[in-house]
């Protein structure tokens, strides 16, 4: 259920882009993102900082897109979100001296501190790379190509990177039974 809630706004965006246009799809994305937060609250699911950042950026860039009737702003939202995530991860490493990924997953998965740091830097680079690729596609490709990249390209690339992250974590996991 949580996975469906996670992707429902982007699925709705894609469907309404195909049925109408980028502006209708943007409005649907805005409403869908608000409904996502409300559903998480009703289902007593955790609402993370990432959810709030995405909500704020969707509302800001969506509103400007609709007010100015300029799709450039909603296209930039993707890059802004990925840069914000990269900055939050980097900020955690710099100011808290601890990987934010470790803070989220460290209770369940035991890795050496160096592995957590490398993993966090990998995610920072990944987010910045996605932001840059989005900027390129938004600027030089058609609107339809950008929508397809946003929905399918980013999802596919993220899935592959997440699977790679899982393999990395498995390879570096500390077996607590053999440590005793």
Curated annotation (Swiss-Prot):
Described purpose of this protein according to its UniProt entry: Plays a role in cell envelope biogenesis, maintenance of cell envelope integrity and membrane homeostasis.
Family: Belongs to the YciB family.
Keywords: Cell inner membrane, Cell membrane, Membrane, Transmembrane, Transmembrane helix
Transmembrane regions listed in the UniProt entry: 10-30, 47-67, 74-94, 121-141, 151-171
Main location: membrane
Designated name of the protein: Inner membrane-spanning protein YciB
Superkingdom of origin: Bacteria
Source organism phylogeny: Bacteria, Pseudomonadati, Pseudomonadota, Gammaproteobacteria, Alteromonadales
Membrane topology: Multi-pass membrane protein
UniProt xrefs under InterPro entries: YciB (IPR006008)
Compartments in which it is found: Cell inner membrane
């Amino acid at each position: 259920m949580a996975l469906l809630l996670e992707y429902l706004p982007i699925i709705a965006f894609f469907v309404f882009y195909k049925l109408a246009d980028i502006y209708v799809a943007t409005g649907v994305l805005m409403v869908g993102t608000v409904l996502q937060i409300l559903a998480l609250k009703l289902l007593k699911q955790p609402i993370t900082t990432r959810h709030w950042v995405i909500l704020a950026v969707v509302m800001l860039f969506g509103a400007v897109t609709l007010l100015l009737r300029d799709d450039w702003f909603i296209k930039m939202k993707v890059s802004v979100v990925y840069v914000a995530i990269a900055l939050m991860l980097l900020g955690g490493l710099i100011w808290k001296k601890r990987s934010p990924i470790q803070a989220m997953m460290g209770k369940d998965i035991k890795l050496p501190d160096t592995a957590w740091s490398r993993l966090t830097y990998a995610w920072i680079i990944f987010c910045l790379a996605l932001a840059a690729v989005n900027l390129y596609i938004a600027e030089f490709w058609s609107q339809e190509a950008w929508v397809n990249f946003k929905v399918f390209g980013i999802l596919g690339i993220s899935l592959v990177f997440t699977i790679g992250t899982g393999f990395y974590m498995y390879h570096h996991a500390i077996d607590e039974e053999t440590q005793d």
